[in-house]
């Protein structure tokens, strides 16, 4: 089922946390180890990046505003990661971000398998 699927995922995140706090939050959520702005977990690597396209006004657009959120997370599986576990872990990260009050939207080939279709389906 997953053999042909690209497992790269980009999560756009809008939060009041600064980047260092977001890195800590993600590391705790995914039970990972921090190395500057990269978190390594048993299932994947997460890079927390500032979004060069960040624009507070454009981020409010209900259709594609997520493209202008303050941060994005580049997420890739580690070698030999189980695809099902990897996708479930991203789903759990999304849920934790939403629960914290952050806005988060996933852009990946498996959005349909994530809660709220990766954040595009609203509440």
Pin down the residues of each PLM region.
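Short, extreme N-terminal segment that most often corresponds to the first beta-strand
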Residues: 1-32
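Intrinsic low-complexity, intrinsically disordered or marginally ordered coil/linker segments
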Residues: 1-8, 62-74, 79, 113-123
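Ordered hydrophobic segments in well-structured contexts
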Residues: 10-12, 47, 70-74, 103-107
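Structural motif
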Residues: 12-17, 76-78, 110
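Short, surface-exposed beta-strand/loop "edge" segments at domain boundaries and coil↔beta transitions
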Residues: 19-22, 79-85
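Short, intrinsically disordered low-complexity segments
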Residues: 33-82
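Well-ordered, non-membrane alpha-helical segments in soluble/globular domains
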Residues: 83-93
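Acidic, proline/glycine-rich low-complexity IDRs
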Residues: 91-123
């Amino acid at each position: 089922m997953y053999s042909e699927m690209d497992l790269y995922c980009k999560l756009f995140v809008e939060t009041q946390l600064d980047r260092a706090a977001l890195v800590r939050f993600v590391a705790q959520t995914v039970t990972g180890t921090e190395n500057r702005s990269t978190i390594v977990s048993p299932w994947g690597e997460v890079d927390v990046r500032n979004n060069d396209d960040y624009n507070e006004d454009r981020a409010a657009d209900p259709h594609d505003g997520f493209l202008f959120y303050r941060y994005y997370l580049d997420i890739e599986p580690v070698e030999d990661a189980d695809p099902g576990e990897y996708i479930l872990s991203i789903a759990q990260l999304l849920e934790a971000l939403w629960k914290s009050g952050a806005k988060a939207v996933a852009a990946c080939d498996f959005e349909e398998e994530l809660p709220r279709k990766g954040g595009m389906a609203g509440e």
